[in-house]
């Protein structure tokens, strides 16, 4: 059963690609590109994507002060907008635990090359974020011929939607999850005898990984859309495991947030809404496919 399914899926995916690029150079007499020609085309998509990321990284590298002082290190500052708003909310509802990051985490660099390599790493991450719409467009233009005309119609705007969702995820991770994570991890103590002195690479790794992970997580509706199109995922399956998804979201939110219900809700609700939107998209795709 498994080999048959794989062969069927492989054939249904690759056949349109092989037929959809017949105008390329060096095509065979039947008007279809060979496997090696497809690899060559994919190679150029990857090269152009890498060039775009490098250009974005160079731009980010030149704006070091803005990138670090006003973006990367900002969530650790009491004046960061999220920290200020949560402190105001803490006063309004009389929940002091909501007021976070009032004592900034002390950051140190323990290697001679630490700050320079950190600068390069952050520049590359920023380059990836800046170039994401173009990178997604490059890979989308490679896989788009695998879709039938009707499927292309339904997939219009995929690049724009994926870019907006990724940006929304980055914003959510940076403004919501990152400050809460810094507060939790930076103040956590196994013993009063241990003092936290956080390495700058550890801090930046946490902030960037949280932001990127949120950006990727927000791509869930796009992933569900295409999995539903090829019949791998159904809305019934997602509804069946809805409770499991809720438990996972609540557990993750409880770990990274302060021990109060407001922070838990603040992190959980957007992720649960994202899951419900994905179910709606999967159901819509199934209805369109059966129509």
Language model features: what each stretch is:
Residues 5-291:
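Membrane topogenic/interface segments and analogous intrinsically disordered interaction regions
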Residues 1-3:
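Low-complexity, intrinsically disordered Ser/Thr/Pro- and acidic-rich segments
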């Amino acid at each position: 059963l498994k080999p048959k399914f794989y062969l069927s899926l492989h054939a249904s995916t690759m056949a349109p690609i092989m037929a959809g690029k017949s105008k390329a150079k060096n095509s065979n007499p039947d008007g279809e590109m060979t496997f090696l020609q497809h690899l060559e085309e994919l190679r150029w998509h990857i090269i152009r994507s890498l060039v775009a990321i490098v250009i974005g990284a160079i731009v980010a590298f030149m704006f070091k002060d803005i990138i670090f002082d006003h973006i990367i290190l900002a969530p650790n500052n009491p004046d960061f907008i999220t920290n200020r708003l949560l402190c105001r909310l803490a006063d309004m509802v009389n929940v002091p635990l909501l007021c976070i990051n009032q004592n900034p985490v002390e950051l140190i660099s323990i290697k001679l090359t630490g700050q320079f390599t950190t600068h390069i790493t952050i520049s590359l991450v920023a380059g990836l974020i800046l170039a994401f719409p173009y990178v997604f467009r490059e890979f989308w233009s490679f896989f788009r011929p695998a879709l039938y005309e009707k499927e292309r119609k339904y997939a219009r705007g995929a690049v724009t939607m994926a870019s907006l969702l990724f940006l929304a995820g980055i914003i959510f991770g940076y403004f919501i999850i990152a400050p809460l994570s810094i507060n939790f991890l930076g103040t956590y103590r196994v013993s009063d005898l241990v003092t936290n002195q956080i390495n700058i690479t550890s801090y930046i790794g946490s902030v960037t990984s949280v932001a990127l992970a949120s950006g990727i997580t927000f791509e869930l509706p796009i992933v569900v859309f295409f999995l539903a199109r090829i019949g791998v995922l159904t809305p019934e399956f997602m509804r069946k495991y809805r409770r499991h998804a809720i438990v996972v979201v609540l557990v993750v939110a409880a770990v990274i947030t302060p021990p109060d219900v407001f922070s838990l809700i603040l992190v959980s609700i957007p992720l649960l809404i994202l899951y419900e939107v994905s179910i709606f998209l999967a159901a819509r795709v199934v209805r369109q496919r059966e129509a």
